[in-house]
Amino acid sequence: MNAHDASNDALELFATCPKSFEPLLANELGALSTPGVRPLRGQVAFTGQLADAYRVCLWSRLASRVVLVLSHVDAHDADALYEGLSAIAWEEHLGQGATLAVDAHGTNAELRSTQFVALRSKDAIVDRLLAKRGSRPNVNATRPDVRVAVRVSHGRATVGIDLSGAPLFRRGYESPS
C-alpha cells in the first residue's frame, strides 16, 4: 500500500519523540496548525503537505525526527520484510550516487533484532536499486543523503524517509573544532 499516490493528496507523516511526550508533541503540532494529529506510542502521526513537515522540522521543540511515510509492509518475518521493501520504488527516492542509511525501531516474534531489521531492509533497498540501475548505492551511517526509517510493530512495518537529517535536538549545534 503506497502511503501517497498523488502529489495533491495529503501525505502521511509522523514525528518521533521520547515516550510520554506524545500528548505534549500533539499539542505543539496542533499549535503549528498541523493537520490530522494523532498521538501514538513514541510518535505523533499527522497528515499534510511537505510544507507542514518542514514547518514541524523548523519549529518543533519536542520532535526528534520527522518522517515521510512511503509504505506499510508485511513484516511477519525477514523474507516478508525484504519483499515489502523491495516493492517500493526506491529509484524515485534515491538519486544516482546517493548514499543511504537505515534506522530500524521495534521488533516482533520473528524479527528480534533492530540491527537485523536494518540490515535486511538495507539489503532489499540495495538489491532493488542494483536490479533497476545496475549499480549499488553506498551506505553512509553518519551523513547519508537519504535516511530510511523502518518501524516494526507486530506483523507490519512502516517505511519512510527521514526528512529531518540529524536529530532535531542538534539544530544549531556545532562540534568543537
Model-derived regions, located:
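Accessory substrate-recognition/RNA-binding modules or partner subunits associated with SAM-dependent
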Residues: N2-V146, H154-R156, L163-G172
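Conserved SAM-binding loop and adjacent beta-strand
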Residues: E174-S177
